[in-house]
Amino acid sequence: MKNNINLQDVFLNQVRKENIGITIFLVNGFQLKGFVRGFDNYTIVLDSDGKQQMIYKHAVSTISPNSPVNFSAALKKIND
């Protein structure tokens, strides 16, 4: 049976583990910059200049990492 891959979780977990800065674009056009400290099905906790913000995913339009995210290692673990 083939595993279902949740690419959103893989992406957020990689930027969290590798401490990659991200820019979150909200649906209202506002931008938030910082580092992912945690996430669940509905929210992302972002650390920005020492302050934590909880962002609801339904308000997110786009997440842009400051450097490339390597999916290959994470996807290999899931597929093994």
Curated annotation (Swiss-Prot):
Family: Belongs to the Hfq family.
Name of this protein: RNA-binding protein Hfq
Disulfide bonds: none
Keyword flag RNA-binding: yes
GO CC list: cytosol
Pfam entry (one): Hfq
PANTHER family documented for this protein: RNA-BINDING PROTEIN HFQ (PTHR34772:SF1)
PROSITE patterns tied to this protein: SM
SUPFAM superfamilies, per database record: Sm-like ribonucleoproteins
